[in-house]
Every structure is written in structure tokens, then in C-alpha cells.
Curated annotation (Swiss-Prot):
Protein name in the entry: Chorismate synthase
Species whose genome carries this gene: Chromobacterium violaceum (strain ATCC 12472 / DSM 30191 / JCM 1249 / CCUG 213 / NBRC 12614 / NCIMB 9131 / NCTC 9757 / MK)
Keyword Cell division among record annotations: no
Gene that this sequence comes from: aroC
Described function: This reaction introduces a second double bond into the aromatic ring system.
Enzyme kind, highest EC tier: lyase
Amino acid sequence: MSGSSMGRLFTVTSFGESHGPGIGCVVDGCPPGLALSEADIQLELDRRKPGTSRHVTQRREPDTVEILSGVYEGKTTGTPIALLIRNTDQRSKDYGNIADTFRPGHADYCYWHKYGTRDPRGGGRSSARETAVRVAAGAIAKKWLNEKYGIVIRGHMTQIGEVAIPFKSWEHVGGNPFFSADPDIVPRLEEYMDSIRKSLDSIGARLRVVADNVPVGWGEPVFDRLDADIAYAMMSINAVKGVEIGAGFGCVTQKGSEHGDELTPRGFASNHAGGVLGGISTGQQIDVSIAIKPTSSIAQPRRSINKQGEAVTMETHGRHDPCVGIRATPIAEAMLALVLIDHALRHRAQCGDVRVETPRIAGHIG
């Protein structure tokens, strides 16, 4: 299977399946000298791990990370960093009845036609279980970006199903299971998700992730535009069906006099571009939103076919997220960090000595 690696100078190659012995990744290209411990990575993994509330899968995985290489005496050496997360709570018997059938909305049918074989246990390689190692790799990227440039990457949920979530303050995001920036709406979200779960159904979600303090100039036009790579990274996350940067699809109804972000000596007057113009960072906040489809594994009867092409009716039982988007915020943060660190290193390699007389202006003066 190709396609398990991303990045040019900071590369990440992931491996493993949902019900195999473990999952992991190899991070190559991390600059030497970064203070790094398993605890640094674990902080991010704990934000994503399953079983943390009744609104996510009840699979109990500690997601304990092991650093196998690339770190000596607490600092990165510049050599490949191998990370391993062992699976401890597989329940493969839940999938015995679907080994010969294809779950609607899943990759089963596509994997079977492409490879002539598939691992039915939890979706195998196509499972969102794989995203844990992206969060682990992203933790390294976030730490380096913050220490080198002061970049802060964070995300919050903006909508679950029909419930829009207002933004009040970043300080509230870590205090509830929904990554909500509004604590007052949490009871409504609890009630809404309880109703979804009791109906044996699932629901989609939307979230926003931003990066502050990104320098102006990152991005490689034409085909390696910063926003193109961000969209590529976000679309690689399981269940993501749409990506917006800045105004996104909202720009369709905007006029040029509104959408174009005016520059003043004090700073940009707006940020409809989402921090990227011409594929290059403007120095403004990188602003990304993603749409996540409803979890396909539900316990309601659904029509499908088996390997022989015969019609079947199936129910997917097991421990599944009624809203997979709830745990996606740390994943989206990680993917944004991985894109930014790769472009940071590429920019430093080619244009690190470039200086211009024009001062850098403020990101947004409102």
C-alpha cells in the first residue's frame, strides 16, 4: 500500500491497523536539539483518545506512546523518530458477521476491489484508529513551531448536527467533551447526542482550527501552495468531506470590495483569505474549517451486498463514535501543524536569508 507518507522535509509515515498489535509512525526530518519526551506527546494523545465520555466510542485504549528512536538524553538527534502505540482493547469478535459483507458508507467495498483482500476488524487500515499516530507526530511539530516561532495551533467545534456552537472563549474548549468554546451550550449538546445515540444513529460535525503567529512568506507556489497542502492534509482525515479556508464557500456571495483584505500601515483590515494569498502565508491567522460526515457504522438495518453480489440487510454492532467529529479537533490541529512545520523547513532552506524593506504589518486590525 502506497500513500502512507506525507511531507517533503518533515515526513511522517504511519503504519498499523485498528485491531493489530499496534499502530505507529516514523517521523523523519525533525531538526535536532528539540527537547522532547513521551509526556510531551501524551498530552496531545490524551485529548483524542477513546472512551473519555459517553458520547464517543467506549473502546478503552490508553494510547500510551513509546519513543523508540531519534531522541537521546531528552533531545531530538535529527535522525528518524519512531513512535509506537500498542493496541490493548481490540474486540474483533464484533466484526465476525461482516467479513463477507460490505458496510454501507465504509471503505470495505473499495478496499476489496483495489487489493483483493481486506481486514474486516474495525476497518483495518481505513479505521480512524490510525489518526492517533498523526496526533503523536503533530505533537512534535506543534512543540517545535511554538518554540521556534511562537506559533499557537488550536481548534474548537462549531457545529454538531443541527446545533451551532457559538464561540465565546478559548479557555472553555478544554473543559468539556465537545471541544466547545461556549460552556452554556454543553447541556444542549449532551441532550442532543443522547438522543442520537438512543436512536441507534449518528451525526456529522464541523470544527475550526487556527494557527496564530505564522510568519509571512511560507508556501511554495504553484502546486505546493500552503492552502493546497492544508486542504490535502485535512481531506486525508477519515470522514472529512469538506474544507474551507478563510471565508471558504462563503466567498461566493461576497463582492470583491468585501472579500479582498485591505492593507493599511496598521495591518490587514480583515482576513477573508484565511491567512493565505497566492499560496503563501500573509502573516495573518491561518483559519481552517472542516466538515465531518456522520459515522457510517450504526446499528440500524441497512441494505448492502456480500462478496458474491447478493443483497443483504446488515446492522453494524460494536463500539463506535455516534459523532466521530467530537474527537477530530486534536487530529485537525496535528495535521495543520505537520503542514506548517514542513513549509517552515522548506522556506528556511530556500528563502531563509531573504530580507525586504517593507515592515510586516499586523494580522488583523478589525
